[in-house]
């Protein structure tokens, strides 16, 4: 996604059978990113500010959902700011993630959910793009990676990692 003048809104549909999952936001230095998470009932966390390192615990009383938000910088000299959101017993429905930044430099960010089999099929981004889904180890520098091909459909496999790395 990209933060505009105000903020970027990302919608996540959480399925009925979801017992918990982790979502990661990776930003670009030198920006500092903030999240405000809204539950299906409309309860909000308020702005959670990223930084060098820290944690915040939030309980959504109406949904009985617990959220642990951790933020840190991967490389403190010039690395990417990261916000990790751990949802425990998430209520089913549409969760809104509002992303803001300091408005410095490139204002793009990436938001990831776990891969297949680590999350229910009913939990997904309502609007997603498959073109920036490279995962480790294919996202390192000086490495050529390949995706998987589905010969039945004559195209890349739907679960294939593909796209450009973050750097």
Predicted regions and their residues:
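Loop-rich non-cytosolic ectodomains and luminal regions
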Residues: 1-167
